[in-house]
A protein has these predicted regions:
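Short hydrophobic transmembrane-like helices used for membrane targeting/insertion
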Residues: 1-3, 17
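Phosphate- and other anionic-substrate recognition elements at nucleic-acid/protein interfaces
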Residues: 16-216
Length: 216
């Protein structure tokens, strides 16, 4: 069973998972949105149950889409203060959106074992001299961080991965068990409707790393 689509009030039609009710969620942070994958099955034979896009911005609050671009002309210290209101709004959006997904899964008899989050890692943004590049970098960190906070607020076990380090972590932890991480991801993609891009694969990999696994 799989579902594709956007996250609008969690309008999903999940079916019961027959073999196991344990699932994990993988999230790939993007600007103003996240690619989400719900993964079931086992470590050796994972199964994509759903893939969808979660909105992390409110069209009624334009600044939530690219908050640092809105204050790009300010110094780093001033921009940090200026984005507080929009950042708080984004945090609330992420918390509620993830909560709706978790609730839907639970209503359908599934137990969420944890969430894996992929995105830009923390860095010293103040050292970036170009304001436009800094705005993009800051938003990359922000939209990953709000997913971290959303997972914590919803009481989920969480692992967070740098997008640049995820592949090597997956090889180290899953390679021997999966018979080849890339091959398995490609095999999973053949059973699903498009899209099946790098973002969906990264979200799936993150979910795979927390499926039935201990907290890291």
């Amino acid at each position: 069973m799989f579902i594709t689509g956007s996250h609008k009030g969690c309008p999903y039609n999940f079916q019961d998972v027959k073999k196991s009710n344990i699932v994990s969620i993988g999230l790939r942070a993007k600007t103003a949105r996240a690619i989400a994958v719900v993964l079931g099955g086992t470590i050796e034979a994972p199964l994509v149950l759903a893939k969808l896009e979660i909105a992390l911005a409110d069209p009624k609050i334009p600044a939530t889409a690219q908050p640092y671009h809105e204050v790009m002309d300010l110094s780093w210290e001033e921009s940090q203060k200026a984005v507080r209101k929009s950042t708080a709004a984004i945090e609330a959006i992420a918390r509620k959106a993830l909560g709706r997904l978790i609730k839907k899964l639970q209503v359908d008899g599934m137990r969420v074992s944890g969430v894996g989050i992929v995105g830009a890692k923390d860095r010293d943004l103040a050292r970036i001299g170009n304001y436009h590049i800094r705005a993009h970098a800051a938003e990359g960190v922000l939209f990953r961080r709000v997913l971290d906070l959303a997972a914590d607020a919803n009481g989920l076990k969480r692992r967070t991965f740098s997008d640049r380090e995820l592949d090597q972590i997956a090889v180290n932890e899953l390679g021997a068990k999966s018979g080849g991480v890339k091959r398995k991801l490609n095999d999973l993609g053949r059973t699903l409707p498009p899209p099946w891009r790098a973002d969906e694969k990264q979200a799936t990999t993150a979910a795979w790393l927390v499926l039935h696994g201990p907290r890291k």
